[in-house]
Every structure is written in C-alpha cells, then in structure tokens.
Amino acid sequence: MLSNTLRSNFLKFYANRHHAIVPSSPIFPHNDPSILFTNAGMNQFKDIFLNKETVSYSRATTSQKCIRAGGKHNDLDNVGHTSRHLTFFEMLGNFSFGDYFKKQAIAFAWEVSLSVFNFDPNLIYATVHEKDDEAFALWEQHLPSERIFRLTDKDNFWSMAETGPCGYCSELLFDRGANFGKATSPLEDTDGERFLEYWNLVFMEFNRTADGSLLSLPSKHVDTGAGLERLVSIISGTNTVFEADVLRLLISKTEELSGKKYHEDEALGAAFRVIADHTRSLSFAIADGLLPGNTERGYVLRKILRRSVNYGKRLGFTKPFLAEIVPSLVDSMGEAYPELRLSLSQIQEVMTTEEENYFKSLHRGGNLLQQVLKSSSTSSLISGEDAFKLKDTYGLPLDEIALLAKDYNFSVDLETFYQLEKEAKERSRKNIAKSQNATDAIYDSLSLGENSEFIGYNDLSCDTFIEAIVSEGKQVSSLQEKEKGALILKSTPFYAEKGGQIGDSGEIFCSDGTFVVSHTTSPKAGIVIHHGEVSQGQLSQAQAVTTQVNCIRRKRISNNHTGCHLLHKALEMTLGDHIRQAGSYVDDSKIRLDFTHPKAISPEDLASIELLVNEKIRENHQVETRNTLYSDVVNSKEIKQFFGDKYSDVVRVVSAGFSHELCGGTHAEFTGDLGYFRILKEHAVATGIRRIEAVTGKEAEILAHQDNEDLNEIALILQSPRDQILHKLQNILEEKKEQAKQISELETKLIHSLLDKLIDHCQQVNDVSFLIHHLPESESHRLQQYANCLHQKIPSRLISLWTTQKNGKYIIFSRISDDLIKQGLQAKDLLKILLAPCGGRWGGKDIFAQGSADSLPQTDALNNTLWQWISTQLN
C-alpha cells in the first residue's frame, strides 16, 4: 500500500531530524469539548501551543487520524459527490514548539516534497500571506517568484479562536496538468482541481487580543498538515482520492458484495464512494470507543452509518453489509493502527446491530408514511412536521419520503421541514456549547504558581498551604464556618477523581478551623480541587494547613481499583483477546467495569472469571508500580493500554500478578489485601458493550453471608435439605408446567363450548356471516384467541368483532376470513369506520386489527354499521 510507505517514510524523515514520533491521538478529544472529533494534527498539541502543557520534546511528527463530520468542519454531505471530500482522513504533520520556525519548516517541506513524495519541482507552487515577506523570500530559495502567490487573510491566515495564538500560513500546491482544468495558475483555478493543495504550513507568531491587535508571541511555533489520501492520489495519478490505495480496495470489496461495478453507472458512483469513506470513519471511531447514539458524537456516528445504508440500498443491499467490508480495511491499515485488529469483532458487531435496527426503522417509517398519506385525505401535501418526524425519529431519508409521496401525487412542505431541521441543529449546537461551558471557567482564571503536587501514592497526610479558595463560582479570600467551597493546595495527598476512580475525602485543618473534604476533582491538568465545607472556625488563602485523607475509605477504593485490574485480565483470559475496557468506575463500595463483548456471559464463564480473580488474590502478589517512557511500552502486548486514551511522555505501569496496565490510580499493596471477590451482576449497557459490577473484601463477605442466609430460607420454605434444593425446585417447576398445560386444555374446551353456542347467533348479509360479542374484562387477554378459534370453525365468509373493557377503556378486535380479504375487505378499515366517530385509535393488518376508545355505540348500532359496511364493500 502506497499510503503505508508514505506514512512510514514521512515519519522517518522527521525522526531522523530530531522529531519525536508521537502516536495519533484518539478520533475524539478527551479534554476538549469545543470540537466533536479530532479534525487536525494540531488538536492534541493545543495545550502546548497555549502554554498550558509542557512536554519533553520541542519537535514532533505525527500521522493523525481525523474525522470531519460535525461542527465547524463538516464534510459529511459532500462526501461521495466530489473528488476529494472525506469524513475520515489521515493528516501527516510536523510541529515545532518554540524550536525552529519559518526557515527550517519551509526547508523541510521542500526536501520532503522532493525526496519523500518524489514530486517534480517544476510542478510545485506556493502561496504565502500578502504581508509575509519573510516566507516569500524563503520560498524564493526553492521556487521562481512567478510560482509564489500572495493571498489574503481568507486563504493564508490561521487562528485557533477569535483571540489567542494565530499567524500566517503557507500552502504548497501541485500542478496536476491540463487534464484537470484550463487554469494556468492557482489564482485562476477556482475549484482547486488542477493546482491541488497538498500541504499547509502554519506559523504561529502572533497573539490576537480582544481589540483585534496582533502582538508578537514570545515563543513561536510551527504546525503543518498534509492530507495523506490527497498525496496518494497525486502520486498515483488518479482523478479522485477514491481510485487509489485503501479507498479503492474498499470500493472493490463493495463491488464484490453488491455484484455491481464502480464505473458501470456513474449514478451509482456516489454510493461506492460513500460506503468506502464511511466504513473507515465508523471503524476507527468504534475502535476508539465511540458508539452510535442519540446525542453529540454518537448521533453523528449513527448519521454516518445510516447514510451508508441509504446509499447501500442503491446498490441493492437489503440487509446488513458493512461488517463484511471491514476486514479489508483491517488488512490494509491494521499494522499502522493495531486498534483496528483488536476491535474487529466489536466493530462488526456494532455495525451489524445498528444496521439491523435501522432497516427495522425504515420499515416502520415506510408504514408510518403510508398512514400519513392516507390520513391526509383533504390535502395532497405532507406537512413539514410529519416529514421531519419520519426522518428524525424513524430515520426515513427525505429523498425516500419525497419519492414515495410522488407515487401518490403528494408533495412535501420542504420550507417547514428545513426550518425544523435548522432548529434541531441549533439545539444540538447549543447543547455542545453548554457541555463546553460546563467546566467551571473560574479555574482557568486563577493566578496560581506551579501545578498542585500530588504526593498521595506514598503519603496520606502532609503540611502545605492554601493557594486559592473558590466559593459560588468566584475566588474568595476566606471561608467561614458552615460555608461551602473549594480549596486548591500547594501540595496534596488527596487523589482527584479521574481514570474511573472516585476522588478522596478527608479533612484539611489549621489552628483556626477545619475543612471537611467531601470529594476531590481535577477540572484541568495540574489543578486538584478539594470540595467541602468548613465544619468549625475559618480558613484563609495562603494559610498553612495540615491534610488528612480518610485512610479507611482510600484503602477500600485502592483495593477495588486493583480488583478492577484483576477482573479485566480475567475477562481477557476467559473470553478472548477482543476484550477491551470501555469504561470503569471504582469507589469504596464496588467495582463497575464496562468492556467490549458481543453477547451475555454464560454463568459458567462468570464463575470461571470469579474463581480466577480469587486465585490471584490468594496468591498474594505484590502490586508494583513503575514510571517509564510511553515510547518504550506503546507497542507492548503485555501491558494493557486503552486506545482512545491520550498518554503523556512518562507513564505509570501497575503490575498485579498476571495484570499489567498503564494507570495513574491508587492500588492495594498486595493482591491479598482484597480478601475476597464476588461478581454482583453482568448485563448489557450498549450494543456490543457489557458491564460487570463486583465487590471485594467486607462487601464480598456480606454478599456471601446473605447468599448463605437466602439458601437456608429457601430450604426452610421448601422443607428440603440444602443439597436437595435444586432437585426439589425442578420437581415443582415440572408440576407447574403440567398444571398449566391442563388448565390451557380446559380453557380451550370452554372456549369451543361457548363458540358452539355463539355460532347460532351469527347474522347474515347475503352469504357473509358476522358476529359481535362482548367479553368480560377478565377475558380481555383472550380476544385474539376467541377470534382465531371461531375462524377455525367457520374458515370462510366470516367477519367477527370482539369487544371488552380494560382499565376503563373499550377494546375492540376484528378478524376477517381470507376469502373476504381477496374481495377487498380489510379488518383495519372496518375499525376505522367504527372508531373514527368515537375519537378512537386503531391499527393492524388486513386479516386482523385492534383498537380502543373511551366509548362505543350500543350493540344494535354496531350491528347496523357492520351490516352497511359489508353491503357496501361487497357491492
């Protein structure tokens, strides 16, 4: 694969020039709610550019996996209809953090273009900002001035936000030749097809203030990005990014599955392109831990999947198919991104389940659309509200709604539809903004010295001082007795909630007062917030204090965290290598672990998992921790790490017997400290995600004791020895089953006896028999059974109506024999005639239907209505 070669050579080029090769960050940013998905290589370095984070390197290079399908950068609707729009792409990049600047960045880019990309230097063009004389002069060392163009802020100025770091940028373009347009320069090439941009170099040299002024940054940075798919297309000489390398491979697999050819019909070309691109987006997102859902990122993911299905229908797919394409993707990209291989079964399971659900929704939506069309008897217009509901709730695409409406000479109120869609998007945008603002901004504005020093791995108390106090969203100088607030300390033994572990509680005290810590959080890196209340006295900023963590609670939390690691490893050993943590939570009372697995775990496997964890507890292994460079363990198969998590340069490895994980949490000293481990329950929390809840130590002992007491109580009730309980229960169930069978047979005889009498009361319209009978509420659950039995006795020319009352409402059930259906009679039409005047509701099929209403006409009136309806229908 050319993409694998290019990626590898690009990274090697910069590594040989003292750049750290930094792994791609997750497809979604963990600590940046301002964007839905990672959409550029610089996202993971944002805090470095903002001077909020320091790293051990000043130069870096990456191949970043990106998705642009939501928010400001949203290419979703264009994918499939242009030559180069993608929702998923890889961004090659090199970065300098206060190290080299324009001169070296431009020299590197030129050398890479010639030696790595093997571009003809005579076909390379550059653009610079109109005011960037320095960049222009530097490019003149490599290019004639007539191939360097000055452009405005619109094209060649980059900013992270309205204020903050920003700077000029320079783009590199490749002339693909006259076959791609008649333009003779990038200025004439308005669609960018001939002179194709392949690399953008951003020079962060300014800080934009609120009044728009540009101030020079004390430390200048470089951020570059080159789209890998676009480079592959240029080098391969293809017209589009879809005709080369990985994307063409996925299109070929789709051709094989569909039996259609990509270039056979241009009208179908978009479908092949959409499926190839969307399969990549979905696979990488699921591998990083995202799942389709109804909000934010999950909603976008579901939208991508459903768009794939909609286009797949154009190729003849009527059942799930995406999972069959994924192995081709894994074969081509799994070496560079091992998370794809590890998550293959999970990706396929999620895709298939989502597709099945969507096909069901489409079927329901189609039926609902038919109802909408039939109910619009006075108009030939489907309301915008109905159309939007069909799309938003049931997933029926607008184009399918419009096509089906056209078959009935209906049209759709598009103006209202688009307005509702706009309002829904605005609500979604506001929800995202609300989520973004949820992090208390006060902590960003505090003037603090160095980050809070955490000493809690080894010490549970220390002497320190108060750096800041926050109360009711603002910084204050002191807290009085009974006042609630948050303290920030110079150093702390309190563990802040993160990594699935709950934060510590305890006390902070001084000569003037005591502050009871209820919980501890870390809203931003390096800051530990101690939340609580002054129980007596007062505390002031800069005051010397003594801290004391609740030792007993911390011990239980630490034991449970170690238990979570042991459980994770036991799951993998029992169920297979596909097991991946999808979330966890540990506190002082329980363990909760979410993990990837396609089905419920059998009781036998759960027992094996529990036994294995307890075996490791009895072996009493020392729990060891060590710090090491992430680069030394990133490819280790023995040490568990979680794709989707972002790790720093130095990581902490926790080893407990057979378990080895990257983890920053607190742990037991020995596995034997856990005492005992019990699983409480196992259940599904999402498609392909299971959850186990468990306990250790005293809680596990209490559970075992309760189980023992329950068994004693059951034995007493059954009047059976404990070792005979199971046998006794089996006998009882067999007896109950036999009794139920006898009751059912007796009920059937009684029903047939009643029906024999009712047959004599059937009325006639021409040669059609019809019956109306009211059942008592106690028999309301047997409406359909009565109807079916009667129609077995009289299989033709029969219509029956059965009514009853339930919870104050009238229930009515209709059944029509098959031969009358062939003459055009339908059970649901009959109920419509009967219930519409009463304001009732109904639904069903041709052969039977059911409805309800607050009131019904008297039996004579029902007889007359039924008689008239039959006469009209048959005549």
From Swiss-Prot:
**A Pfam family this chain is assigned to:** tRNA_SAD
Annotated Zn(2+) binding sites: 561, 565, 663, 667
Query: Do the record's keywords include ATP-binding?
Result: yes
A GO CC term? cytosol
Q: What is its EC number?
A: 6.1.1.7
Going by the UniProt record, its keywords in alphabetical order are: Aminoacyl-tRNA synthetase, ATP-binding, Cytoplasm, Ligase, Metal-binding, Nucleotide-binding, Protein biosynthesis, RNA-binding, tRNA-binding, Zinc
According to its UniProt record, where is this protein mainly located? cytoplasm
Q: Name one GO biological process term.
A: alanyl-tRNA aminoacylation
Q: List the Gene Ontology MF annotations in alphabetical order.
A: alanine-tRNA ligase activity; aminoacyl-tRNA deacylase activity; ATP binding; tRNA binding; zinc ion binding
Q: Which reaction does it catalyse?
A: tRNA(Ala) + L-alanine + ATP = L-alanyl-tRNA(Ala) + AMP + diphosphate
Cofactor info, note text: Binds 1 zinc ion per subunit.
Report the domain of life of the source organism.
Bacteria
Q: Where in the cell is it found?
A: Cytoplasm
Q: Which HAMAP family match?
A: Ala_tRNA_synth_B
Family from the record = Belongs to the class-II aminoacyl-tRNA synthetase family.
Note what the entry says on domains: Consists of three domains; the N-terminal catalytic domain, the editing domain and the C-terminal C-Ala domain. The editing domain removes incorrectly charged amino acids, while the C-Ala domain, along with tRNA(Ala), serves as a bridge to cooperatively bring together the editing and aminoacylation centers thus stimulating deacylation of misacylated tRNAs.
- Name-wise, this protein is Alanine--tRNA ligase
* UniProt organism field: Chlamydia felis (strain Fe/C-56)
